[in-house]
Amino acid sequence: MYLQGVQDEFQRQTGRRPFGVVQSAQDRDGNSYIAFALGMPAVAKISPDGKNVEAWAHEDGNGGQRPGYSGITFDPHSNKILAFGGPRPLTAFSLDKPNPRPEPVHINGDFGKLDGTEKIVTVPVNGQSVLVGARAPYAISFQSWDGWKSASIKKTKREELRNSGFTAVTDYYDGKELGLYGVSAFFDNGAHGGRADWPLFKLDSGILYF
């Protein structure tokens, strides 16, 4: 079964068709989870050998122009898949349950608007998981001490990210130093846009420490 078949199954179950694949995450068993950004909040699951693709999870959207999840990642400590954006800042799915359902994560702090969320990553920090998502011009970090029933947040901002197509955060290690870069797509400067450089923007790594 290909993704078209999964989209057909979501449509059969819900009457709505997800599209716009944005990011994938892998669990410890090698299964992949693909998030859809458009049509509806939905996640497809693909087996390690790629032979089995299933309509794994979905929920109602919030009526926005981009109702689906914008990013997805895996936290090995809680054995949960975390989706970013869409109907809420953060949504958890427990892989310890046979039929995981979307579980809203309560945010302790001011997340701000949902518009503009992009990808999210898991960064290991001092034996724990910190999630960092992109929402121009901010990088927003999350940490939880209760298995993602709730999460605290921190933000850092760079004005260069406001109009550069800020889509993702990546972590780096330089000796003992752990840091973050913002990655931009520069949508206005595509293959024929004349841009000759594609910079990374260093972010304040203080958002990794709670």
Predicted regions and their residues:
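Beta-propeller fold detector
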Residues: 1-8, 53-60, 101-109, 150-160
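Beta-rich, blade/repeat-based domains predominating
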Residues: 5-32, 60-84, 110-130, 161-177
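Short loop/turn segments immediately following the C-termini of beta-strands
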Residues: 29, 37-39, 77, 81, ...
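Surface loops at the rim/top face of extracytoplasmic beta-rich domains
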Residues: 33-58, 71, 83-84, 91
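Structural motif
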Residues: 40-44, 89-94, 137-144, 190-202
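Short loop/turn segments that connect beta-strands within beta-propeller blades
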Residues: 46-51, 94-99, 145-149, 204-206
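Active-site/pore-lining binding-face segments in mid-to-C-terminal subdomains
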Residues: 96-98, 102-157
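Blade-level signature of beta-propeller repeat domains, shared across WD40, Kelch, NHL, RCC1
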Residues: 168-210
